[in-house]
Regions:
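Conserved ABC ATPase signature
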Residues: 141-145, 149-151
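Catalytic Walker B motif of ABC-type/P-loop ATPase nucleotide-binding domains
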Residues: 166-169
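Conserved ABC transporter NBD signature motif
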Residues: 64-72
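Short coil-to-helix segment of the ABC ATPase nucleotide-binding domain corresponding to the Q-loop/switch region
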Residues: 101-109
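ABC ATPase NBD coupling module
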Residues: 19, 73-89, 118, 190-192
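A short, proline-enriched helix->beta-strand linker immediately N-terminal to the Walker B motif
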Residues: 160-164
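Helix-to-loop junction immediately C-terminal to a conserved catalytic motif
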Residues: 56
Length: 232
C-alpha cells in the first residue's frame, strides 16, 4: 500500500488494541485534506478518543498506519516528536489551562515549549488573542474568565504555534448551547483562514447546524463518511 502520505491526516487500516484487550479500533481508514473541516462523531466507546490519541501521538497504532502531517506515528523518532507537535494544536473539553498563570503566560508557555523566541511571543500572542476575541484579557487569570472565555484561551493556545492542523476533543462539552455555537463558529473562522480542523463531538444539533463533512464511527469502525446530517 501507500508508504507515505503528505496530507494532514491519513489513517490506513488503523487498529488499536489496549493492554487490557479492548479492541478500540478495528481497521479504520480515512484521510483529511489540507484546509478541510471534519466532524468525527459516534456514540461513547466508538473509538473517537482513541483516534485523537493516535493523532497526537499519545498512543501508537497496534496495526495499520497513522500519518500526521507527513510523520508516521508508529515509528516517529523521539527527537521528531516536538516537530510533529508543532504541526498539530489540540483543544480539550476541560480547557487544561494553568490556573496560577495569566492568559498571556499560558500562551507563552506553549510557545517556549517549542523554542519560540521572545520576539515571536511578542508578535504572536496579541494576534491569536485578537483572533479569538480576547485582546483585553491578556493579564487575566483563568478563574476570572467564564467557561466560554476559558475555551477561547485554550483555542488561542492551540493556535499559538501556528499549527497546520487543529484537533478539538469535545470542545463544547462543558458549555451551554449559546457558547457552544460561538466556539464552533470560531473554529469555522479559523478553518476559513486555512487551518485544517477536526472536531470530535457528540452534539448532534451543532453538527447538523454547520453542514460539514462528517465521519461517523461505531464500535471501532467507520460506518459513514460524507456531507450531511448526523443521524444514528
Amino acid at each position: 500500500g501507500v508508504q507515505t502520505c503528505a496530507l494532514p491526516i491519513c489513517l490506513i487500516d488503523a487498529e488499536k488494541v489496549y493492554d487490557n484487550g479492548t479492541r478500540a479500533l478495528k481497521g479504520v481508514s480515512f484521510t483529511v485534506d489540507d484546509g478541510e473541516f471534519v466532524f468525527l462523531v459516534g456514540p461513547s466507546g466508538s473509538g473517537k478518543s482513541t483516534i485523537i490519541k493516535l493523532m497526537t501521538g499519545e498512543v501508537v497504532p497496534t496495526a495499520g498506519r497513522v500519518m500526521v502531517n507527513g510523520f508516521s506515528m508508529s515509528r516517529i523518532a523521539e527527537k521528531q516528536i516536538p516537530y510533529m507537535r508543532r504541526t498539530i494544536g489540540v483543544i480539550f473539553q476541560d480547557f487544561r489551562l494553568i490556573g496560577n498563570k495569566t492568559v498571556r503566560d499560558n500562551l507563552a508557555l506553549a510557545m517556549r515549549a517549542v523554542g519560540a523566541s521572545p520576539r515571536e511571543l511578542k508578535n504572536r500572542i496579541p494576534y491569536v488573542l485578537e483572533l479569538v476575541g480576547l485582546a483585553d484579557k491578556e493579564n487575566s487569570y483563568p478563574d476570572q474568565l467564564s467557561g466560554g472565555e476559558q475555551q477561547r484561551v485554550a483555542i488561542a493556545r492551540a493556535l499559538v504555534n501556528n499549527p497546520s492542523t487543529i484537533v478539538a476533543d469535545e470542545p463544547t462539552g462543558n458549555l451551554d448551547p449559546g457558547r457552544s455555537l460561538e466556539i464552533m463558529t470560531l473554529l469555522e473562522r479559523i478553518n476559513a483562514l486555512g487551518t485544517t480542523v477536526i472536531v470530535v463531538t457528540h452534539e448532534r444539533g451543532l453538527v447538523n447546524h454547520f453542514n460539514k463533512r462528517i465521519i461517523l464511527l461505531n464500535d471501532g469502525q467507520v460506518i459513514g463518511d460524507g456531507l450531511g446530517s448526523y443521524e444514528v
